[in-house]
Each structure stands twice: as C-alpha cells, then as structure tokens.
Design a protein with these regions (language model features):
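Compositionally biased alpha-helical segments
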Residues: 1-42, 47-48, 52-56
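Outer-membrane beta-barrel domain signature
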Residues: 22-26, 40-46, 80-86, 116-122, ...
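Residues on the lipid-exposed face of transmembrane beta-strands in outer-membrane beta-barrel proteins
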Residues: 35-39, 53-59, 95-99, 129-133, ...
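Transmembrane beta-strands of outer-membrane beta-barrel pores
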Residues: 39-43, 61, 72-76, 113-117, ...
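Residues that define the transmembrane beta-barrel architecture of outer-membrane proteins
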Residues: 47-51, 87-91, 123-127, 141, ...
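Repeated loop/turn-to-beta-strand initiation elements of outer-membrane beta-barrel proteins
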Residues: 62-68, 103-107, 138-143, 177-183, ...
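Detector for outer-membrane/organellar transmembrane beta-barrel domains
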Residues: 140-191
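Predominantly the C-terminal beta-signal and adjacent terminal strand-loop region
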Residues: 194-249
Length: 249
C-alpha cells in the first residue's frame, strides 16, 4: 500500500496513455511551475505600455523544498509630440532551498539578484543562510519565519558600490482560500550589522491566484522594495502591482 500523504497526483490509465502532459506531470510529480503574463496598452493623449512576466519553479519532496522565481516589469509613456519615456525597467530573480531538520524546523539558503534602471541600480545581489521555523503548518495554512547572516552587494550606474554584512529576518505565509484560490505573502528585512538603524533593505511580496480552469489562473501580484540609502535623485520606495493570467504546468 502507498501511504495517502505520498500520493501527489492521481489519474486514470487512459489519461496517462493518451496525454503527453499527464505523463510529464507523473515524471516530474514533485515539481510545480507557473508562467505569469500581464499586458496593458493605452492610445490617447498619453500613450502607455505595460508588460509584466514571471516564471516560478518549485520542487517539494520530503525534507527538501526548492524555489526559483524570475520576474520582469516594464512600463513606458509617450506624451503627444514627445519622445517615449521609460518609467519602469526592472528584473529580479530569487532562489531558496529549505532542508527540514524536524517537523517544524528547517535550514535555509537563499540568493536574490535585482536590476532596476529607474533606481539607477546596476546590480543588487544578496545571499543569506540560517535557520527557520514553521509556527503554523496545516494543510491549508503555513506561516514560517527564518533568520541568518548574509551579505548585500549593490552596484549603481557610474560604478559606485554600497556593500554590507547583514542578518536577514524573513517570514512567509501561504494559505488556501475559498473557491480554490491561494494567497502568498513574504517579507524580508536586511539591516546592515554595523548601522542597522540607518542602512537597511525591506522587500515584500504578495499574490492572490483564482483558478479559471485546470491550468489557468487569474492572478493579482504586488512587490514593494524599500532601500533606506538609495542612489542620489531616486526614491527610497519602489512599488508595483500587476493583474493578469498565470499558466500552471
């Protein structure tokens, strides 16, 4: 007999034999993936173009939980008789590996990298490793926190660097809601060890997905990044929201 908790997907023999997609899902049963796409265009006195894409991969097998996400945002505007202006051009990637040490405790290692033209950020890369704990671990609700030492590397256009050692404090929430919808929230606080009151970075992610059919969701997502020491002539805060479609694999 196969324990119920080890059953990740079920389908009939005919479904398996007639569908290449089902065979792939069986072979990669520990993996989930989604591709998100949002697009907007306005043709008026002020023309606007918006594009947002994301690719997320996750492999969750007992003891090991791996996540990778790649995200891109672009927005431009054009006034009548003027040249087109880029308002947002940002690329972000993040990866994290959790290793269960007990039912609730886990070790983690993570890496985040970001490019932001509007914030004059050529590259920000930060990595951290440490210990985490699941405060709530139910079938439809998971709340966890984690902390550990790390390093933040920041290079701005023009060659200026701003690097520091940090201790990461992070948290995540995942919840299954009515109608099959899902909500995710995550936050990270990365202060400089030697100047934690004045130099720090705060990142917050959130998204809500509502199923349309077996492979397509409607998704609303938001990201907020606050840098207490931004480059000259740029704002501390960078906030973006998107609404579009999410294709599940």
């Amino acid at each position: 007999r196969i324990p119920f908790e080890k059953i990740y997907r079920s389908f009939t023999r005919d479904q398996y034999e007639q569908s290449r997609l089902e065979r792939l899902r069986a072979r990669f049963r520990y993996w989930t993936a989604n591709f998100d796409l949002a697009f907007g265009f306005t043709d008026a006195t002020t023309d606007t173009t918006n594009l947002s894409t994301a690719l997320e991969l996750r492999r969750n097998k007992k003891r090991l939980d791996f996540f990778f996400g790649g995200y891109y945002w672009f927005r431009s505007t054009k006034e009548s008789g003027e040249s087109r202006v880029t308002d947002e051009n940002r690329l972000l990637g993040r990866a994290r590996l959790n290793l269960d040490l007990s039912d609730r405790t886990f070790a983690f290692s993570q890496l985040t990298a970001e490019y932001d033209e509007i914030q004059n950020l050529s590259l920000r890369a930060d990595q951290a490793a440490g210990i985490g704990y699941r405060f709530v671990d139910r079938e439809k609700l998971m709340i966890s926190g984690r902390s550990g030492p790390g390093y933040v590397y920041q290079r701005y256009f023009g060659g200026e660097n701003d690097n520091y050692f940090t201790i990461l404090f992070g948290g995540n929430l995942e919840a299954e809601l009515p109608y099959g919808s899902k909500f995710r929230w995550g936050a990270e606080y990365l202060p400089e060890v030697s100047d934690w009151q004045d130099t720090y970075l705060i990142r917050t992610f959130a998204d809500w997905a509502l199923p349309i059919n077996g492979w397509l969701d409607f998704k609303i997502a938001a990201i907020n990044i606050y840098n207490s020491q931004p480059e000259e002539d740029t704002e501390n805060n960078s906030f973006t929201t998107t609404a579009g479609l999410s294709f599940r694999f």
